[in-house]
Design a protein with these regions (language model features):
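Signal-transmission linkers at sensory-effector interfaces
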Residues: 1-25
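… and, occasionally, acidic/histidine-rich disordered N-termini of signaling adaptors
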Residues: 31-32, 166-241
């Protein structure tokens, strides 16, 4: 009964800490700070001594933080971890495709593999080595670490989307300025030419385009009419124009 009570108290404590950690992750929009908070949470809540954090970039695992000695020497072997979908003890993985990877992890004294999931896809990997008190990780500890890792991954993805939104908004503002400049280069009025009616208007299918026109009086009754149309649309065409 005492053991059950201790386990229950531990679960309640972990749930409360997950709630608090989730709020902290929710206000961070920089990948470096999110990874740092994840590291501190693992060390503070589980007493993790050595760990490594990988994130998926261009279908490869990129090491973002590590306290595991000599890990860098095995980075190529660890790329297959990108296919791991469930957390577990290193010794429990039996997949043939992970054989060399698991052997390398055992040599590095890594005990736990935790995929960092987002929308049912492995977006990162968390490796846990020994703890400060050298106690083994329980199933509850693995579940807790997995929860923290997934919260961190959600925060990282939200931060990425936030950055993309800001960049898109900035680009739209710059394109609008470019449109105003481009429209300003077009003649506001056309000269009256005897025996000719000339009308011109430029309505781009996008914010900027590759069309241009001009009517210039040379001398007396001589005029030059210029009409240009760059192949393509949008920004590439406008840059050429």
């Amino acid at each position: 009964l005492q053991r059950l009570n201790r386990d229950l108290d531990k679960k309640i404590q972990q749930l409360n800490s997950l709630f608090d950690i989730g709020k902290e992750f929710g206000v961070l929009f920089e990948e470096e700070k999110i990874i740092k908070l994840l590291s501190f949470s693992l060390m503070g809540q589980l007493g993790v001594k050595n760990y490594a954090i990988f994130l998926k970039e261009n279908n490869s695992l990129v090491l973002k933080a590590s306290r595991i000695p000599y890990l860098e020497q095995s980075l190529e072997l660890l790329q297959n971890l990108i296919y791991v979908k469930n957390p577990g003890y290193v010794s429990s993985f039996r997949n043939k495709n992970l054989r060399k990877c698991i052997k390398a992890l055992k040599g590095l004294n890594v005990e736990i593999i935790i995929p960092m999931m987002f929308q049912n896809e492995t977006k990162g990997i968390l490796l846990l080595s020994n703890r400060l008190n050298n106690e083994p990780y329980s199933i509850s500890d693995i579940e807790y670490a997995s929860s923290i890792a997934n919260i961190a991954m959600l925060s990282i993805e939200n931060a990425r989307l936030f950055r993309e939104t800001l960049e898109k908004h900035k680009l739209e503002e710059e394109i609008q300025i470019a449109r105003e400049i481009q429209q300003g280069l077009l003649p506001k009025s056309l000269p009256e030419i005897k025996n000719y009616d000339i009308f011109a208007i430029n309505i781009s299918s996008k914010q900027v385009g590759g069309d241009y026109f001009e009517v210039m009086q040379m001398n007396g009754e001589e005029y030059i009419i210029a009409i240009a149309d760059v192949s393509g649309k949008g920004i590439p065409a406008s840059l050429l124009m």
